[in-house]
Every structure is written in C-alpha cells, then in structure tokens.
Amino acid sequence: MFNYVIILPLALFLLAYKFFFTSKKQRYYLPPSPSYSLPILGHHLLIKPPVHRLFHRLSNIHGPIFYLRLGSRRAVVISSSSLARECFTGQNDVIVSNRPRFLTSKYIAYNYTTIATTSYGDHWRNLRRICSLEIVSSKRLANFLHIRKEEIQRMLTRLSRDARVGKEVELESILYDLTFNNIVRMVTGKIYYGDDVSDKEEAELFKKLFTFITTNSGARHPGEYLPFMKIFGGSFEKEVKAAAKVIDEMLQRLLDECKSDKDGNTMVNHLLSLQQDDPEYYTDIIIKGLMLGIMVASSETSALTIEWAMASLLNHPKVLDKVKLEIDEIIGQDRLIEESDIANLPYLQNVVSETLRLHPAAPVLVPRSTAEDIKIGGYDVPRDTMVMVNAWAIHRDPDLWTEPERFNPERFNGGEGEKDDVRMLIAFGSGRRICPGVGLAHKIVTLALGSLIQCFDWKKVNEKEIDMSEGPGMAMRMMVPLRALCKTRPIMNKLPAYTKV
C-alpha cells in the first residue's frame, strides 16, 4: 500500500511534466537554458546562494535572458537594462505585472490580497491608490516628521553612550531598531525599542518572523516549487502556516489598540476612518495586509542600506572625509541635520545612490508573473512564467557604469557621458509595481546616514578591510554584521540627551 502512495503521485507528476514542459518546447522559442536539468527537479540543484551572483554567472554563459525550470515552475531571468526596460514599459508592463503564487503569499499575505502579492487588477490599483495618496503621500509623511527626528535622536543618544567608553558597536541591530521604530510608530503609534519599553520580546519576534519571510519568499525555498515534497515529510508549508498565525495575531493586537485610541494620528487610524465609510472593502484583513506590507518592505531594507553605506565608507575613508566635510560646511556643528537639508547635500545623496547601486536591498527584484504569452528579447515567454530581474547585475554592467565594481559616489555628479546615469538604478523596482514607499525609504536612509556622519568620527575595529560578503535571502544582508568604533563629535555635547532610549 505504501508503494502505491509513493509511486502514484510521482507517476502523475511525471506525466504532467511530460505534457506541460516537453510538449510545449515544440511550440515555444524559449530563451537559452543551462543544459543540466533533471526530470521533476529541473534546475533546482543549480540554485545556490547568493542567487544574484549565480544568475550573473549564468547570464555570462547564456546571455542577458535565460530560462530555468524550477520544479513545477517556469522562470526567466533578465540581467540587462534594455530587456528590463522592455518588460517594464508600455503594454508589456501590464502583462508582466502579476505575482507568482507562493505559499508565503497565500498564508502570510492573506491569500494573495496584499499590495505586494496580489495580481494586477482593480484590487491592486485600489491598494496602490491608497498607499500613494493616503499612506505615503508627501503630506502624510510630513505629519510624521517629528517621529523620524525623535528616532534619530534616540539612536544618536544610544550610540553616544557606547562611544564615550570606547565600546565597539554592532550597527545591524542599532539600525534595525531605528527603522523598525520609525515604521511601526508611523503605522500604529507604538514604540518597540527604548529603555522605557516593555515589549522588546514582541519586537524581537516580529524581527524573527520578518526575517523568515524575506529568507523564504520568492521561490527561495524548494517547498514553493516542489509540492510533492510534503508527501515525503516536507514541513515548509506547516512552518509557513505557523508563522502566518503568529503574525496575524500580532497585527490584530496592534489593530485593536488603534481602534481603542480613536484620536490617534497614525496610518492605521486613517485606514480605520476609511473603514467606517466602506466597511465591506476596508476589512480588518485589508488593513492588516497594508500594515504587513509597509512594515516588512520598509524596516529591514532601510536598515540594510544604511549598514552597507557605513561599511563602504569605512573601507573608503577619503569618501567618508569628503561627505563629512560637506555636512560640516553646509550645516556645521551647532544643529542636527534635518530632512530639509538633504537637497543641499548632493555628495551625501551620491553616497546613498552608490550604495543602492552596489548593494541593492533586493538584488533580484520581487518576481513578477506573465498574465499571457509574451515576447521578451525576441524569445517566447509563456503565460504564468516567473520573471526575475537581476538588479545587482544591471547595476554592475560595464556598458552602463564606469569601473562598475568600484565604490565611487562621484559618478553621479551629472556629467555629459552616456554612462553613470542615476536614472538607471532600479533598486526599488520599475514600472507599475515600483515600490510605493521609495520616498519614505530615501528620507530615512539619507537622514540617518547623514546624522551618523555628522555626530561621530568612525573607524574600523582593526586594519583589515570590512568583509563585504553577502548573506542569503531576498533581502541582501551582510554575511558578517558590521562592527565599528565611533567617537562623539562636538555637536553631541550641545544636544540634550534623549532619555527614552
């Protein structure tokens, strides 16, 4: 009996493979593909982290677009700016604006109903409108300026305590606390990190769950494209369901707290006012999905970008000195840098742009899916094919960038050449599904980085180069979290201590 339980599903899967893949090869002119492909598994055994570097190596062999079969899923990988532009402009941008259906999207993202996971259509357009006009609009972000300023001062005071005793600081956790507090306060009004906070355990659980999402989303776990694995005891779906249950309970508690505070000035309180006008559409699930999307997309990625920027500056002390000089000349040591100053700090902006070029938080953009058959680069891309764009490879294309492996913020000074154009950056995506929170991310990253440089002198813990190796997952972490030494600059002696750290 056991043999039939094992053999029958495998036989059915092989028949499906024969029908859906082998027969269709005769009809489609597919992009080039690695020759090493196994029945059922396809190219699964080729996939090793970091995926963006693997895809870059494969593109050097097979060209700027190539085809993969990941178990039951088709995928194409794009590694050139021109082909990415072909995907993300005109009618193609509509056809390639769906999302693949993953287990994480089904269970954690409320059955594919969040802005990041739902397919293109009326529901997505409405969510996008809500985000752009009601949640991350310029007016709404201006209302939360005091939060961003307070959280910056909280971080600076925390760092100054370590700096005064010459303590080595680990920046990853400090930066995550900064960005997470920023986002959650804007969304719900709650503070998770600080001396007077009693919910640090819940905050750490949120961090653990968000890391689970970014590590396992986007076809990074074989359980997403080898569904038969659960027959052999694969536990991925159970793990996703368990994580989804905990996340939903935590989001519901935050939502209930906002409901009880009817005078609150948060993103959720604004969504609750929309719920009163249209309760059938703005359900608790829709609101929790928006909360989840903003918190996952904004907190970790911003922290990682600041960390990569600091690591790059520590490895390039002359660049660090130059951006420090710019801040000192424009702002001085009598007041803290503010968001309104950023427009007058072009070199600081260049440093952020160069960091996003070399170390995009999502090196392979969130996968899209084709709504119908389409041609890309002259090749057939069938319906329901995952389309993955390797932003990391495009950002290091020697046809687009001068000395692409070199950290060089001066490249964005606005010369007349055809290369080094900041408009070629796609760190936040492109087309219809570009990240709606890009403006907020730039504000948090640039202000935080400028504040760290203005208020402290930084140096490496030893003479060795900072290890710039990359970790696995959808969000590109440093393999070795950044540690550094800092010393307070005169401005910190003029600022009152922010006690609620």
Curated annotation (Swiss-Prot):
User: According to its UniProt record, where is this protein located?
Assistant: Membrane
Q: How does it sit in the membrane?
A: Single-pass membrane protein
DNA-binding found in the keyword field: no
Query: Which keywords fit this entry according to its UniProt record?
Result: Heme, Iron, Isopeptide bond, Membrane, Metal-binding, Monooxygenase, Oxidoreductase, Transmembrane, Transmembrane helix, Ubl conjugation
Q: What Gene3D superfamilies does its record include? A: Cytochrome P450
Residues spanning the membrane = 285-305
Give a Pfam family name: p450
- The protein's name is Cytochrome P450 81F4
The protein's organism comes out as Arabidopsis thaliana (Mouse-ear cress)
